[in-house]
């Protein structure tokens, strides 16, 4: 089966990367993997992937190079740093970046990679969290040449229920910024709602089912409100650190574009405050703890 499928390589085996790789392996794709910490590489090697020691080895055989990394700096290091992908990259390959990165930096890196070795870049950040990665129901927002995105569609269909081309390189990252503005502001309001319901004597565990199907309903509400009501913060499905990074990107982008985003600016400061109290690596459901102290 794998002989007729393109060979893939994947860098970044975090909360999202591992389940995404598992879906690609289950579909029969030949897959090489790299992660900074070897434990995740070994985990997927035991499931059929080829583990490599440095990112450059990913580009030796793969037709499609995939990244799912923490931030813009990590993407730049894996692609252009010592032992990076650029050392073995060649014309005809495609690089697909699932990371949430800065749009301007994405455009710059894409131009540099194509100029240096002829590899084209598609930014394809995703939304749907670990449940979406596990079930293959992610929403994928892509930026790049239309032909390149169509070439990727069969592979990406294993990972997402919807792939939308938003424009040229960088457009996917702009769309992800918009997505994260909505998600992060929503998470903060849900935390306020949960704490208020508790203090007013309402069973906060009933809020999400009571509002289901109404105008206030959302996936974040249905996921976060029950966790907050139960103070159930494990296992960590996403990180406060990630939301803060994305809000900072939103504020930076709005400044560059001359756009007003006051709610996201305030959300960034509230998220930073929460992170400074030891919650950066915790689940955003912990945001409710910020509001459980009475205001006299």
Question: Residue ranges of each PLM-predicted region?
Answer:
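NAD(P)+-binding Rossmann beta1-loop-alpha1 motif at the extreme N-terminus of oxidoreductases
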Residues: 1-67, 98-99, 108, 130
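Interdomain hinge/lid region at the active-site interface
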Residues: 219-280, 284
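Rossmann-fold NAD(P) dinucleotide-binding segment
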Residues: 55-67, 71-120
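Beta-strand segments within the central parallel beta-sheet cores of soluble alpha/beta enzyme folds
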Residues: 205-213, 265-269
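Active-site-proximal catalytic alpha-helix in oxidoreductases
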Residues: 135-142, 164, 168-200, 209-223, ...
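Rossmann-fold dinucleotide-binding core
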Residues: 100-180
């Amino acid at each position: 089966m794998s002989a007729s499928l393109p060979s893939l390589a994947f860098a970044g085996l975090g909360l999202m990367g591992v389940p995404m790789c598992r879906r690609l392996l289950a579909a029969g794709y030949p897959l090489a993997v790299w992660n900074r910490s070897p434990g995740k590489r070994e985990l997927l090697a035991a499931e059929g992937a080829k583990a490599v020691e440095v990112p450059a080895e990913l580009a030796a055989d793969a037709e499609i190079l995939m990244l799912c990394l923490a931030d813009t700096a990590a993407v730049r290091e894996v692609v252009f740093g010592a032992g990076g992908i650029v050392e073995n990259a060649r014309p005809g390959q495609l690089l697909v970046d699932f990371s949430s990165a800065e749009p301007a930096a994405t455009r710059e890196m894409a131009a540099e990679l194509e100029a240096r070795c002829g590899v084209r870049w598609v930014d394809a950040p995703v939304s749907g969290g670990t449940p979406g990665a596990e079930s293959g129901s992610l929403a994928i927002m892509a930026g790049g040449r239309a032909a390149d995105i169509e070439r990727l569609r069969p592979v990406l269909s294993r990972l997402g229920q919807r792939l939308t081309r938003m424009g040229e390189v960088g457009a996917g990252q702009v769309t992800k910024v918009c997505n994260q503005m909505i998600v992060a502001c929503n998470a903060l309001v849900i935390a306020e709602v949960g704490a208020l319901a508790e203090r007013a004597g309402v069973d906060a565990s009933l809020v999400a089912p009571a509002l289901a199907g109404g105008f206030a309903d959302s996936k974040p509400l249905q996921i976060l409100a029950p966790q907050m009501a139960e103070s159930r913060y494990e296992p960590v499905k996403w990180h406060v650190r990630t939301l803060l990074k994305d809000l900072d990107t939103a504020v930076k982008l709005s400044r560059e574009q001359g756009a007003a985003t006051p709610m996201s600016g305030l959300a960034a400061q509230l998220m930073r405050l929460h992170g400074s109290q030891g919650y950066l690596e915790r689940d955003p459901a912990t945001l409710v703890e910020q509001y459980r102290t009475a205001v006299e």
